[in-house]
Amino acid sequence: LSDRVKLAAKLDATRISITPMDKRGKLSKKLEKTVNIQIHFTVAKNVTAAVGEKTFYCRITQPNEELLVKPGAGTFPFEGKQIPYSIRREIEYNGEDTPVTMYWPVEESLQSGTYRVKLFADGNLIGQASFTL
């Protein structure tokens, strides 16, 4: 029964959108003009999940399978290991649909190809998506 409660309390990221942005904050159609990558999602309503401050982690994997990570970035627990993250964001979760937006400031040369984004909270993978630059 406790496993069922844990499963029911798991958060879920829905409506995930990833937008490469230029310096004006508009959609960037060119790799070299991308200065930010915006990741937006909604944490779905869940009356079973604990309310309060939640930390969300985002991992962005490049086409060559390397993780985008800033120097000195931390790690978080997942499946018994500490794994590095690209972006971390804390929000107040009240059990209702909650929008979350994260930004990756582009300071490295980006490769053309498909990038994968994975979102985590409370030690669980809560959503994933991909985008192509």
PLM features: residue spans?
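Membrane-proximal structural modules of membrane-associated proteins and complexes
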Residues: 1-133
